[in-house]
Amino acid sequence: MITKKIRVYGIVQGVGFRPTVSRHAAAAGITGSVCNKGPYVEIFAQGEEKCVKNFLERLEKQPPKRAAILKINTEDVKEEEYGKFNDFQIIESEKTKGEIFVSPDIAICEECKKEMYDPKDRRYLHPFINCTCCGPRLTILDALPYDRERTSMKEFPMCPDCASEYEDPATRRYDAQPVCCNDCGPEVYLTGREERGRAAIIATRKMIHDGGIVAIKGIGGFHLCCDATNEEAVQRLRTLKNRPAKPFAVMARDVEAVKQECLVNEVQEEILDGHQKPILLLEKRKKSADSTGLCKSVAPGNPKVGIMLPYAPVQMLLFRYDDGIQMPDYLVMTSGNASGAPICRDDKEAVEELSQLCDLILSHDRKIRIRADDSVMDFYKGEPYMIRRSRGYAPLPTMVTMPWKGQVLAAGGELKNTFCIGVDGRFYLSPYVGDLEDLRTVKALQETIHRFETLLEVEPEVAACDLHPKYNSTVVAEELGLPVVKIQHHYAHILSCMAENDRKEQVIGVAFDGTGYGTDGTIWGGELLLADYHGFERMGSIEPFLQIGGDISAKEGWRIAVSLIYQQTQDKEQTMEIVKKLNLCSEPECKVILAMADRKMNAVTSTSAGRLFDAVSAILGIRTKSTFEGEASMALEFAAEAYEKELWEIDEPADGESDPDEEKKEPEDRLIMKIGSLIKYLTEKKTEGIQAEKLAYIFHQKLADLITDGCRKIRKKTKCNCVALSGGVFQNRLLLRMVEEGLEKEHFTVLRHHLIPANDGGIALGQAAYAMQYIQEGK
């Protein structure tokens, strides 16, 4: 007879871990106990040595489906120390300080789906069905350990039947904290109307069927929903949301419905129908003009559509119910928020912000503690490539194997904000918060930071934030009453890539994005950095240009196009002639831009790769303006991909090799990626009538060549052979592939993002990593 004390670390709360341990104990023939300590699960296993060994093997090989075991510590203990166990017991949770891991929300499982549609089951058509394998977790959590009294489900006492299941180790709902049924659980209702329960769901389905727009409260917030096959309904939603072109997310009935509209491989199907159920960016199928299905206005001008499957029971009931209403296979399911505001999470917010955007609001009385937007995932070389990390993924920690000790908070960026809490080598990136230009989103950030500090039981020693002095994220960090460390935007991008890849040594960082405040007070965005956790050196950048017009230049790429042409020609008349041929703008508009350039009026020096893409999109006549962030740049990428797909013959330009200024350095001896000759080539070929798609492809290839060449020169100088690629421009998969392949041909080790976004949604991780190193050095 032996006794072992076992501690299991990882995602072990809210995933049915203790019931699984109890079943394994029974199968192995051992006695003992299991207790949720908060940071870990503690198990005492007593029995014959072979039985205890069998139990441990089961634990390692057959953990709960949704668990993530990071480590298992075992030690032998003496029987007299803890006594003899007569049976195996699940002990009530205890609160212990230490490593904490919080489970994200989990999509409805197959077993619950079957029960929900079984007329004989007592949870038939129950909008809140769940079990130990699925249901809300993070979004209902007040504190740890994860028990019902510390969630928003504490307001719903279990009925005798649910309590019986909850207490029975033989059931799937043993110790399932959100367990409930139609008799004791939350209830759906229409705000401002009498319909509740079944009547509310039927009224919602009928409204969607008839072409209306509804707001629906889900797990992490509200969605705005309409029939995605109804052109009139989708266009009306676009008008109400003032969203003329930005793609809407779609929810499909099932996998087969997705395959009718999109190309889906095995990896994508597994993720699409997995327990996290993010929005996947999938390639549209080519369809005939008269085919039915998704209407064109869902994702206009985009070869992909963002699509997901229902992950909450109430969403499944929208597609299938027993009321005889024939519902479409596809619903628009876009975040329920007013422009610029965070996703709504309660009735007050929904009524105030969504009433003017929809015809009905379907809500429920289970409170959402933490907002969680849908995660968005692209694919690159057959692997997931995260665009927005939120529901289903946050707050799973990123582990960095550095000998760090301490607690830090990073406030993140101004756009696509997430924040990050670092505890030693574990970094908890929050769900998506949003753009902080709106004070409502700033308030949401402050509230969520406070709740996370409570959940993770941390008291940060320092707060990290962006270098920009006027960012709201900077203000949030400064108001925390902690020592503040400020990190340059693009340096934080590179550190986030290093942290995700657990890279400890120095890298050449290629940070390409739209904007970031530089250490010299100018706008950066096309940077080559030499970086590690101690600091960075700016080794190179895109050739600086004037960004004319302030913030509006980010929406009107033609302005930067005129500026770039003028910078290349150094002649007003010649510039105006080229602008006229390209039909970039009117003559008066051109004259204004040139005058502003001469006087440096409302003009800032910039090295922004994002704005360069916008300008080239305008020069090639693809997009001169953007109605949403990245629209012109995305259109340029799609044009280049279309060219590559057709395998047209490439006529290589005689680019910068003939530029006499190609090898010139700036005063601080910074490597400059010269773009003047490339702009000249593109304008000349476009006026000659060369296809825009072909020129878009050439632009991508030549920019990739400039990056590769720059990294090669930096390696020669520094002997650093590892390159990290980060920043929102690297969401452009064509550029990413061209750069990665170019670097690999030069025998570089290349790091890129995977499940941490390359965009500003990931920089909080880099900020937190720097702050942690800052603590170690006692700065």
Model-identified regions with their sequence ranges:
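Short glycine-rich phosphate-binding loop at a beta-alpha junction
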Residues: 215, 457-469, 718-729
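Internal gly/pro-rich beta-alpha loop/helix module
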Residues: 62, 165, 323, 327-402, ...
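A phosphate-binding glycine/aspartate-rich beta-alpha loop in the early core of alpha/beta enzymes
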Residues: 76, 159, 221-286
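Conserved phosphate-binding catalytic cores of ATP/NTP-utilizing and phosphoryl-transfer enzymes
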Residues: 259-264, 317, 343-348, 374-375, ...
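Conserved phosphate-binding/catalytic loops in two-lobed NTP-binding clefts
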Residues: 466, 481-493, 721-724, 733, ...
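Glycine-rich phosphate-binding/hydrolytic loop that grips phosphoryl groups
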Residues: 491-512, 516-518, 557-566, 701, ...
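A contiguous, well-structured pocket-lining segment that forms one wall/lid of small-molecule binding clefts
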Residues: 178, 185-187, 413-451, 563-720, ...
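Intrinsically disordered, low-complexity, mixed-charge
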Residues: 1-178, 182, 189
